[in-house]
């Protein structure tokens, strides 16, 4: 190859690399700069990962959780960094309407706006009480639906009211599950609740689109969060141990269609970041499935 061509190609790649570096660090340094976000279930797992990622991208973040100790500690830790935006904690049980209304009202009163509401709080339910439909436990079913579905509905209600009242074209995101896409992926109550979240998302998107409010949800495959690991450990008996996370991840990998990768909480946080940012400005009523293709592959005959 002529030296001139090699030199021109080298120059092109150098310029290209420089442009990409400047794009990443200068033009788009923070994708949520100036925005205010509420993240329920923000003290642990997917919620915690999202709190940290949103804060890193310039958002003012309000952590909402029933775990006051973990929530307060996380907020204090993130707010201690000089370059970080404000991160606050508000105690909230998403199944209690007064708590959800207070969460939204305090956030708006304190920061003047609400741009992003991430309905992430949820429960898996008692595995032993939901092992078989023949042993259906109505009280346990009501508990799961109260937190997972009622909590999302209340979040949508009060979050949308605040956005509409102040004319903000915000976005509402909810955590669903692959169990809300197909059967046989989780306990009965949990599966019913996640199907309901997908339905609520689509219906709310149809109604709120006229206000410029986008409503979407995320359906992850198995993520080895404390909730999932605890449920798995309780089913087999005993307390959670340090190596249970790795063991759980290995189990999920064995079921996965996409090999060579491990789904972690930060991957779901990245999906939430996309849906919360202006990059998804025309995405509405969508269930973003983050499962490495498992729900597609399991529906394929003979593959």
UniProtKB/Swiss-Prot annotation:
UniProt-annotated binding residues for NAD(+): 38-62
Keyword vocabulary terms for this entry: Oxidoreductase
Main EC class the enzyme belongs to: oxidoreductase
Record-level Gene Ontology MF annotations: oxidoreductase activity
EC number(s) reported in the record: 1.1.1.-
Catalytic-site annotation from UniProt: 190 (proton acceptor)
Gene3D superfamilies in the cross-refs: NAD(P)-binding Rossmann-like Domain (3.40.50.720)
Binding-site residues, substrate: 177
Superkingdom of origin: Eukaryota
PANTHER family: 3-OXOACYL-(ACYL-CARRIER-PROTEIN) REDUCTASE (AFU_ORTHOLOGUE AFUA_6G11210), SHORT-CHAIN DEHYDROGENASE REDUCTASE 2A
Family listed: Belongs to the short-chain dehydrogenases/reductases (SDR) family.
Name assigned to this protein: Short-chain dehydrogenase reductase 2a
The organism's taxonomic lineage, starting at the top: Eukaryota, Viridiplantae, Streptophyta, Embryophyta, Tracheophyta
């Amino acid at each position: 190859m002529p030296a001139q061509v090699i030199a021109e190609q080298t120059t092109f790649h150098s310029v290209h690399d420089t442009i990409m570096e400047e794009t990443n660090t200068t033009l788009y340094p923070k994708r949520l700069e100036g925005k205010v976000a509420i993240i329920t279930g923000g003290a642990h797992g997917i919620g915690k990962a999202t709190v940290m990622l949103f804060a890193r991208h310039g958002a003012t973040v309000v952590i909402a959780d029933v775990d006051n100790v973990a929530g307060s500690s996380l907020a204090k830790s993130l707010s201690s960094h000089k370059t970080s935006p404000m991160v606050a904690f508000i105690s909230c049980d998403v199944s209690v309407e007064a708590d959800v209304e207070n969460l939204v009202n305090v956030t708006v009163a304190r920061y003047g706006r609400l741009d992003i509401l991430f309905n992430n709080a949820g429960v898996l339910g008692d595995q032993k009480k939901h092992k078989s439909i023949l042993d259906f436990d109505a009280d346990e079913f009501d508990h799961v639906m109260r937190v997972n579905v009622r909590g999302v509905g209340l979040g949508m209600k009060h979050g949308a009211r605040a956005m509409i009242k102040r004319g903000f074209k915000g976005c509402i995101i909810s955590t669903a599950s692959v169990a809300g896409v197909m059967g046989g992926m989780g306990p009965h109550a949990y599966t019913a609740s996640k199907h309901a979240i997908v339905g609520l998302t689509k219906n709310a998107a149809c109604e709120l689109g006229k206000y410029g409010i986008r409503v979407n949800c995320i359906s992850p495959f198995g993520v080895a969060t404390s909730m999932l690991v605890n449920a798995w450990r309780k089913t087999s008996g005993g307390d959670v141990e340090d190596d249970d996370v790795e063991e759980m991840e290995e189990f999920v990998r064995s079921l996965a269609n996409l090999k060579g990768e491990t789904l972690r909480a930060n991957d779901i946080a990245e999906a939430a970041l996309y849906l919360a940012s202006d990059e998804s400005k025309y995405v509405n009523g969508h269930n973003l499935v983050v499962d490495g293709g498992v729900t597609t592959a399991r529906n394929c005959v003979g593959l």
